[in-house]
A protein has these predicted regions:
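Positively charged n-region of N-terminal signal peptides that target proteins for export
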Residues: 1-8
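Bacterial N-terminal signal peptides
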Residues: 8-19
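Amphipathic alpha-helical segments
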Residues: 24-139, 143-151, 173-174
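Short, exposed beta-strand-loop hairpins at the edges of beta-sheets
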Residues: 154-155
Length: 174
């Protein structure tokens, strides 16, 4: 009798687990594909690349100036008085600090590049995420995975990939 009720209990538990797992609906989306298909996103990326190159050139120029000052100092150190040595060393350190501060200003965690990226990309990303959410709610998906960023996905059926539907909802044809 105990074995029979034990089996029945196990059957009920497994039935519940499998029935609730079967009710889950999943979808995949390829965010890289979506963003590459949106011209505004590509333009924003290009704009960020251009400004990044410009700012990096400014930082590089200051670093080259510091290196030049140092090389000149090394070549002339034997001819300099203590005061001249100190003045040159201070100039070199000052130039290096100026380059480091400029680099931090442009490329630091809260730097100009971060601010510009946020200003350009956030509206586009929010629009895409809103479209994904609307499609998920409409179709009853409990989970939408990004196949571009989740390396845990080994295989995903194209039938559950909603990337093209997201692009269509945003007004872009694929």
């Amino acid at each position: 009798m105990l074995k029979r009720s034990h089996r029945a209990l196990l059957f009920i538990i497994f039935s519940f687990i499998f029935s609730s797992a079967g009710a889950q609906k999943f979808a995949l989306v390829d965010m890289d594909y979506i963003f590459k298909s949106i011209p505004a996103y590509e333009r924003a990326n290009e704009q960020l690349n251009q400004v990044s190159k410009k700012w990096q050139a400014e930082v590089d120029a200051l670093q080259i100036e510091a290196q030049t000052l140092y090389k000149n100092y090394q070549n002339e150190v034997v001819f300099l008085s203590q005061e001249q040595k100190k003045a040159r060393q201070d100039a070199i350190v000052g130039k290096e600090q100026e380059a480091a501060e400029l680099k931090k200003k442009y490329f630091g965690p809260q730097g100009e590049l971060f601010k510009k990226r946020t200003a350009l990309m956030t509206p586009i990303q929010e629009e895409v995420y809103t479209a994904v959410k609307e499609i998920a709610e409409l179709r009853g998906y409990q989970l939408v995975l990004d196949r571009a960023s989740d390396q845990g996905i080994i295989f995903g059926s194209p039938k559950i990939d909603i990337s093209n539907e997201v692009l269509s909802k945003l007004g872009y044809s694929n």
